[in-house]
Amino acid sequence: MARKKSMVELHRLGVEDYKKVEKLPVTVVLDNVRSEMNVGSIFRTADAFLIERIILCGITPQPPKAEIHKTALGAEESVHWEYYHTTMEAITKLKCEDYSICSIEQGHDSVSLENFTPEKGQKIALVFGNEVKGVSQEVVDCSDLCIEIPQHGTKHSLNISCCAAIVMWNCFAGKNS
């Protein structure tokens, strides 16, 4: 019978040790995300999958905020983050740093997530959009590609934190395969 692991058996790193661990060359960009709970959840997932940083843009809430902390469980302390007034400022900087800009958006030329495998060492910026409007068209226009999660139900939409978790896991799993 399976037995749950104790906290000791999980071998959790402290914040300072976590900051020293090699991260994936993946940056998450949040394009005008409204919900503090979604932001906190994305911080927590980024911590789990060794994402190098999160860039918060526009109206996206920034730590310290109670709701971010509640859902992040402190991951806003371990994951490096930056803020930009506009997403385009962040995209311009990332392009100068040789990142491939990958908007997570349903588009006419989107690549299905199951067909997306980053090259080893490739620097990727994953852009996730607003809960209602998605990634802004201006950002989509500047992207190197759009990635879409295949969906077969009636809604054809996922909560941004769920979407981000699926895509971050895909990048993490690809690194370890």
Q: What are the functions of these language-model segments?
A:
Residues 1-177:
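Post-transcriptional modification and biogenesis factors for structured RNAs
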